[in-house]
Amino acid sequence: MRSRFSLVLGLSLGIAASASAQTASPPDPDQQFEGSLSLREAYFQKRRIDPWHYNFQTATARLNALQQRQRAEQVQRKALTVSNSLVWQPIGPAPITGGQTPVSFDFPSPVSGRVAVIAIDPVDSAVFVGGAQGGIWRSTDTGASWTPLTDSLGSLAIGSLAISRTDNTPGQATIYVGTGEGNYSCDSYGGVGVYKSTDSGATWSGPYGNAQFNARSVNGLAVDRADPTHLVAVSGSGSYGVSCVANPIRPPRGIFNSNDSGQTWTLTTATSLPANLAGSQLIQDPHTATTWWATMLTQDLGTGAQGGLYKSVDNGVSWTQQMGSATGLPALTVALERVWIDGTDDGAGNSVLYVGTSEPASNKPSESNFGRIYKSVNSGVTWAELKAARGYCQGQCFYDLPIHAEPNNPLVVYTGGAGAFGIAPHGGAETTPSLFMRSNNGGTTFTSHVLSPSTNTALHSDMHSIVSWPGHANEIWVGNDGGVWQSTDGGNTWNNKNTSLQVTQFEGCDTDATTANRFYGGTQDNGTNGYAGDVAWPHLDFGDGGFALIDQVVPNNLVHTYFNQSNNLIGVGYTTGGFATTQNNYLTSFAPTNGIGAGDRVLFYAPLHLDRGAHDSLYFGTQFLYRSDLFFTSATPTFAKLGAGADLAPAVPPSSTGGELSAIETVANIVPGSPAQTIFTGSDNGRVFRSIDGGLSFQEVDTDALGFYVADILVDPNDPMVVYQARSAFTGADPPHTVRKSIDGGATWADASTGLPDVPVNALAPDPTVAGTIWAGTDVGMFVSEDSGGTWTPYNPGLPNVAIFDLKVSKPGSSLLACTHGRGAFLLSSDIIFANGFEN
């Protein structure tokens, strides 16, 4: 008999359808700098870029997919005859307790997720923050609590925030939000334009400028203080990072003006401004309102000297290059990956300006991202380098390089970088360059301000935003990969503000088969964490967390991947102590070896799988498939290569480069009388192999999906002959071929994606109560099929418009766990009581 969970779905969806060595702590990828970040970018890129049609409009496809989903939901709502439905409930992390900072052993701090921008309205005492894909949140109690404001908007990727007021009426601030994250990581989603609120974020209109900004990131946005109907914005590459799409078809990047309060936007086409430069940052001159400054990048244009600092003296109409022309600013010889600008009025008729660049170090002239800062004390007429700040963004200028000049105090300037160099694991002295620095003498010297012993906290790595509270001297707020912090004394002490801010970017998660509401998940730059019924998730292990698994028989056995890199680190973290352990064992590919080839091709987040039949057998994927038997019970677990060392991700022509495994699934053998397991593997270049002899040999079984990334493989728990694949890609096809199905144990495959929009499908899960019902987590939300993949319908009540990266059945019980990339985790549970009293 159907439970209430299934009956409600049937009512709503059926109607709609008719319409190595063990170490104490693994290396932090933030300390590996650009090399490791580029691997994370490549991992994300492979799941979203059409490998055959590089001009395909991937971010435009995302917006189209979201609109298709919303149209289907409108039909669904109109068709419903009952008002009740199961609703996805947020379950955190809010926050992650004991989270990782550069000195986590001494100062474990609550963390939330990547905060890209911050803006403050002093009239309402309101702080607004924008998440990487978490949308806009507001706090009116100085960060004690947070409320999401934009969950239903077309993009939750935030690139810029601007607040405008014509008076001090409470609740009447005008807020502009530029969508599309501008931090130039491949998981920086593109946006859809500019949204506007005239009631301090209670309601929104837009998106405006969709034709100009769709698929881009609005990296800088400012309201003219002399004319609030005039706005200036700069747009960047947007979808999926700095160089993740070759020559995409998208609107031109550049500098834009609006003269009607943000409703329409016009690209600046002055001959002095080269076409299609990417904008990085924008400010109105602190002293002269008709002067504007914009930092620009060439990125994929191959014309490095054209990027840099541009100035307008006619209120944004025309712009001139300052690099190489203004005294003290060097001519560029390499393409800059990012540039930052900020400034303040010195009170004597001049603007004090600071420009941070991703220039190379002097001993590595061909490599960018070293970091230099130039200062002008005469409104940009002349400049001088601040040599004390050399290397301030620590090799990651493309990702984190903020500078903030304290308003009305030309002597105080703050800088942000990647990580806390020079801090020993247990309270060693701080040295510069550092994650966060302050100068009290205009940049002659800098001091590091990362630790806060008196408040028992420390800053997280990767700084993205630094702002002052208007009118409050020395009060600053910062946003980084771990969330939000506040200081009221210029960074000497810090107050952690990651309370109810649910913006965690999950990569993978799992559920406990024996205990309800016990989950485990890996996150971007915030480690691997656990859930045991409270929205505050305890932090369990460090680094970047990827695949995360709970032993379904012995639930204290936990295993997960960190980041992986060929010839650097390949391995797993694990514990047999459950959530009580705060430090995992780290098993690498080096002496004493774990059996995995150190030079293997491997994804940044390598796939893991615990055997369905033999719970202590762990599978690990590179281009080869490895298995470790008795993994948790062995004193020194090691992996052995399966399939006689067969490459299970060989190159797909016309490419000559092989891929890496991305998905693993096992099931009791489908061959009658055979005790051997059936094993499936999928790769990032679309290869699918099967073994029916427990891994002795493999045969390729699906060659019809055009090389698209295999994100998940699911064997139907009610019929092992039925197998599904999730393909993570924008395919440009209708139907999109992002779900494939086999009814003969994986021997042959057919498309099963009718009704899905053209968008990456990241995860699949069976319905916990009804055979033949399958759920799919995508980049634009959740979809469900009640006919074994025949047709699909959106099901998103309570879910923000965010990408779902993993999806698991919660056992025991009848719940589904959805782990998102930017809004934390959500649970769809049959324990919810509806207004009409519907129950099991």
Give, region by region, the residue ranges found by the protein language model.
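Bacterial N-terminal signal peptides that target proteins for export
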Residues: 1-8
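Bacterial N-terminal signal peptides
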Residues: 8-16
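Low-complexity, Pro/Thr/Ser/Gly/Ala-rich linker/spacer regions in secreted
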Residues: 829-840
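Beta-propeller blade termini and top-face loops
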Residues: 24-830
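Boundary at the C-terminal end of the N-terminal hydrophobic targeting segment
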Residues: 19-23
